[in-house]
């Protein structure tokens, strides 16, 4: 499976809940997705709003033939800066998460280690105006190797079917 094929399959699962775009994305990324949600709590009638909670997620996808540790560091900085630029914390802001997916046909062992070490967090006004978590996942489309940071572990289930297919294809070749 190529990185572009894996990207298309991943984007298909995101399209259900996210606004996905392939054009006019921040270079060097291949695609972006955004999710916005606003929940309201009210008392007896909907006009008596007692609370609001706004949640956002900004997702960046990078698909290439290869990925090195240097690439991971460079892309990490670009994604974090752009994600932070898009966030507007205010009193009803709960969270705005930033996620990065690295898809490549050849990911170096150092790059996989680097992805696991990535850790970023931001709180706004001592969390009264929300917070930002940073999630990263790297997937080698040739071997099925998967690496993620602590918060990115919740995203690993998106790759389960692709990993099974890769394992079945490799067993069929033996």
Where are the regions that the model predicts?
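Nucleic-acid nuclease catalytic cores
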Residues: 90-114
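"Short basic amphipathic alpha-helical interaction patches in structured regions
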Residues: 73-78, 112-119
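N-terminal, charge-rich interaction modules
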Residues: 1-64
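A broadly used, surface-exposed interaction patch
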Residues: 57-86
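Short, flexible beta-strand-to-coil junctions
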Residues: 61-67, 104-107, 141-143
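Switch/connector loops and helix/strand junctions flanking conserved nucleotide-binding motifs
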Residues: 70, 108-113, 146-148
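Charged, structured surface patches that assemble and position nucleic-acid processing machinery
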Residues: 118-174
């Amino acid at each position: 499976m190529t990185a572009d094929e894996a990207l298309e399959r991943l984007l298909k699962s995101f399209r259900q809940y996210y606004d996905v775009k392939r054009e006019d994305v921040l270079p060097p990324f291949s695609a972006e997705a955004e999710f916005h949600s606003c929940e309201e709590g009210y008392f007896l009638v909907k006009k008596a709003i007692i609370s609001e909670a706004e949640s956002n997620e900004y997702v960046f996808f990078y698909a290439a033939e290869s990925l090195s540790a240097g690439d991971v560091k460079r892309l990490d900085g670009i994604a974090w800066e752009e994600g932070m630029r898009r966030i507007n914390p205010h009193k009803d802001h709960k969270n705005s998460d930033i996620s990065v997916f690295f898809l490549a046909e050849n990911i170096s062992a150092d790059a996989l280690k680097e992805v696991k070490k990535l850790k970023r967090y931001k709180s706004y006004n001592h969390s009264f105006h929300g917070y930002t978590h940073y999630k990263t996942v790297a997937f080698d489309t040739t071997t099925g190797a998967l690496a993620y940071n602590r918060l990115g572990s919740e995203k690993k289930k998106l790759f389960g079917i692709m990993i099974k297919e890769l394992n079945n294809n490799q067993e069929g070749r033996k």
